[in-house]
């Protein structure tokens, strides 16, 4: 699709990881952060991720109705308990202790809104942590790497060493499941990979 006819794409996220992954698809885009409060009474992690992704996309689409807006939200659940972004080093360490030797679920809700309508979906990936020593927990929590990430770890960094197994889409754990993103963008008429 020639650049002059390509739809304007807006990523409704301030996440550097989402910016990098969308950029890797060869999709020209701009960033507009929604600023919406991520408040919900929803307790089901898949529905919560979808609801928050839709909330962000709808807020930005209301300001830019001519654009294709994409937003996502990632939720981590362990045994039915939601693990948000840790507030500090102590909470990060507590999250890691909870996850040690266990399998968590990572859900990302993605919503694409274009002048033609709204499409959305949820991706789930299971992540199994190794049995962590207290020294590993302390070291990682002190690193600060997990402070801005749901579940308190960054799989694309040193946090990968905490993980024993991943079942599902790796990019989902980073917060932007590329296969789902690509399908939704194509459904809105957006080409990827420069074609």
From Swiss-Prot:
Names of the cofactor(s): a divalent metal cation
BP terms from Gene Ontology: nucleotide metabolic process
Main subcellular location: cytoplasm
Keyword Hydrolase: yes
Function, in words: Nucleoside triphosphate pyrophosphatase that hydrolyzes dTTP and UTP. May have a dual role in cell division arrest and in preventing the incorporation of modified nucleotides into cellular nucleic acids.
NCBIfam families assigned to the protein according to its UniProt record, in alphabetical order: maf, PRK14361.1
Stated name of the protein: dTTP/UTP pyrophosphatase
Native source species: Deinococcus radiodurans (strain ATCC 13939 / DSM 20539 / JCM 16871 / CCUG 27074 / LMG 4051 / NBRC 15346 / NCIMB 9279 / VKM B-1422 / R1)
